[in-house]
UniProtKB/Swiss-Prot annotation:
Ligand binding (ATP): 178-233
Protein name per its UniProtKB record: D-alanine--D-alanine ligase
InterPro entries: ATP-grasp, ATP_grasp_subdomain_1, D-Ala_lig_Van_CS, D_ala_D_ala, Dala_Dala_lig_C, Dala_Dala_lig_N, PreATP-grasp_dom_sf
Key words, A-Z: ATP-binding, Cell shape, Cell wall biogenesis/degradation, Cytoplasm, Ligase, Magnesium, Manganese, Metal-binding, Nucleotide-binding, Peptidoglycan synthesis
Keyword Nucleotide-binding: yes
Cofactor note text: Binds 2 magnesium or manganese ions per subunit.
Binding residues annotated for Mg(2+) 2, in chain numbering: E317, N319
Top EC group: ligase
Length: 355
């Protein structure tokens, strides 16, 4: 970097969550973006891989995983942190980092865990803080806050793990679902991403298996009424001033937008989405309002439902560490808005330094 020191980016990826492989794919994209010609004068990058057991690998070993994923990710020779080594933040690998870029999707990362840990390094990080991350991960708490702000959402019910352990209580739950919601309904673990653990339920007999599946991932369970909708998404970047991207739509071919649809299907991505300008404006306004409500800044992707019959907007959820894979909407939205991936990652670092 002419006239100054290059910023060293600490890219953290992997993690002991169900979204481990998605995180690796996202990290590959971001790693290459920082290595690009337009960024090499400004940045150096160090990769830090966390395996599925929660052990951190050294930067050289981590980089090899991003270059050659066939490397054995769980037996790489050098570990810089494990359960017996708690002073890892003093390690040489960490001392040289100027800005952290966590790309841990799901629990133990996107939920604010990594943000709390990295706070002790006293180095800036890309993305929002602990509170915004935790609220963005917890679908139920998110919905409660949105309800208080009168932000439109689909009808929903909330249950806890222990509710399913008593037969009488369980029967009451089923009765409540049948009384208050119309089929189909979607049963979701409150703390999960990439549609993992979610089931589409079309009749009474499918309710209990779906609840059991969801509580296998998280003890808090969300049940939402399903509507005939379009999947609409909006990107957010910024701090004191939040900027919105073009609006995008995912036109998926499967019955609903599940994990396979997100990462293993040839979905049609439409950017900008073919919607009325008034609806687009309202979606952007709700996106900013919802991020402000949860103290979310840095970057995020805000997901909406647009009911096909009425064009009514429903806020679905906010993703505080959206995917950066080849199929991910977030970088596509910003590319359509004038920021290529190389420019986007640099912009996110600049935002983190502007706090």
């Amino acid at each position: 970097m002419i006239g100054g020191k290059k910023k060293c980016i600490g890219l953290i990826f992997g993690g002991n969550s169900n979204e481990h492989e998605v995180s690796i794919s996202s990290a590959k994209t971001v790693f290459q973006a920082f290595k690009s010609e337009i960024n090499k004068e400004r940045f150096t990058i160090r990769a830090f891989y966390i395996n599925k057991y929660g052990d951190w690998l050294d930067s050289d070993s981590s980089e090899k995983i991003l270059i050659d994923e066939s490397k054995n990710k769980n037996t790489t020779k050098k570990q810089i942190f494990n359960q017996e080594k708690i002073n890892f933040l003093d390690g040489v690998d960490f001392q040289n980092v100027d800005v952290w870029f966590p790309l841990l999707h799901g629990i133990n990362g996107e939920d604010g865990s990594i943000h709390g840990l990295l706070r002790f390094t006293k180095k800036p990080l890309v993305g929002c803080g602990i509170i915004g991350s935790a609220l963005g991960m917890d679908k139920i708490l998110m919905k409660i806050i949105f309800s208080n702000l009168k932000i439109p959402q689909v009808n929903y019910l909330v249950f806890q793990n222990q509710d399913l352990n008593d037969e009488e209580v369980k029967n009451k739950l089923i009765h409540e679902i049948l009384k208050k919601l119309n089929f189909p309904v979607f049963v979701k673990p409150s703390n999960s991403g990439s549609s993992l653990g979610i089931s589409k339920v079309i009749n009474k007999s499918e309710i209990i298996p779906a609840l059991e599946k969801a509580r296998g991932i998280d003890p808090s369970i969300l049940i939402e009424e399903g509507l005939e909708v379009r999947e609409i998404e909006c990107g957010i970047i910024g701090n004191s001033k939040l900027l919105t991207s073009e609006i995008g739509e995912v036109n998926y071919k499967s019955d609903w937008y599940d994990y396979n649809s997100k990462y293993h299907s040839n979905n049609k991505i439409i950017i900008p989405a073919e919607i009325d300008s008034k609806i687009s404006k309202e979606i952007k306004e709700i996106a900013i309002k919802s991020c402000r409500a949860l103290n979310i800044f840095g970057f995020a992707r805000v997901d909406f439902f647009l009911e096909k019959s009425s064009n009514k907007i429903f806020l679905n959820e906010i993703n505080t560490i959206p995917g950066f894979t080849k199929n991910s909407m977030f970088p596509m939205l910003w590319k359509a808005s004038g920021l290529k991936i190389e420019q986007l990652v640099a912009k996110l670092v600049d935002i983190s330094l502007d706090l």
